Structures are given as structure tokens and as C-alpha cells.
Amino acid sequence: VVDHYASLVEGFTGRATRRNRLKYSLDATTAYLNGLRDDLHTFLGTLPAVHIVGVSGEAAEDARVERIPRLAFGVTGVPSETVLRRLLANGIVATQTCATPLLDDMGVADMGGAVTIAMSPFNTQNDIEQLVRTVASLA
């Protein structure tokens, strides 16, 4: 498994120990996944009926925390079960976000629930664009 992760990204030019290749590969993979997540956040943020769950607005500008490559969102007026079914029908893997008191306080239940999307090294920019098109068809 370690060798697989060490070989995910080509182009390493340093001392080719497995440890160095693994660090290079994981750093590059992290940057790639964060880019996909940021693009998804940006594109979904342009859809008026979509509410992205989490830190946003002025609070996000000062947030200097690293985030994992996943995002939860809801579509106002569309139950999360409907969003999930549409995503799955279009070949997009997602999960329904479980209700919690915190999410209830954030208004997630009021908008019909939320779904969560997680990025993997095998996702592409095309996957992000397909996801956004699918969500836009609901909004």
C-alpha cells in the first residue's frame, strides 16, 4: 500500500527513497484534492439554492485551518434524500449527512437536510463539473 501511495504522482526529482517519494506524493495529492474541494465550493456557491454547510463569509476569511477534502451542502426546498438519489443516479458517490443538534442549529434540517461529498485521488475536474451540473438541475 505504501508503495502505491508513493507512486501516485510522477516527477519526483530528489533522493528517491521510498519515504521521500511518499512525502512528495502525499503532498502533491493533498494539494490536488484541496484544489478539487475549493473548485467544488466555488462552483456550488454560485447556485442560489445551494447552502454549503460550515464556515463561510467573514469567518472563513480568518480561518487558517486545514480542511479535509469533503464538503456538505443542501439544496433549499429539496429533501436531501432527493439530492442523494439524483447524485447516485448520475454516478456520483455521496452520503446523506446525519442530523445532529449542531447541524439543526445551523439550519440544515430547515432546508431539507444535507449530503456530503468527499474527494479522492481518482476524482477529476470533470467529476466536479458533473456534480455541479447535477445539483444545478435540482436547484
Residue ranges of model-derived segments:
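Pyridoxal 5′-phosphate
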Residues: 1-139
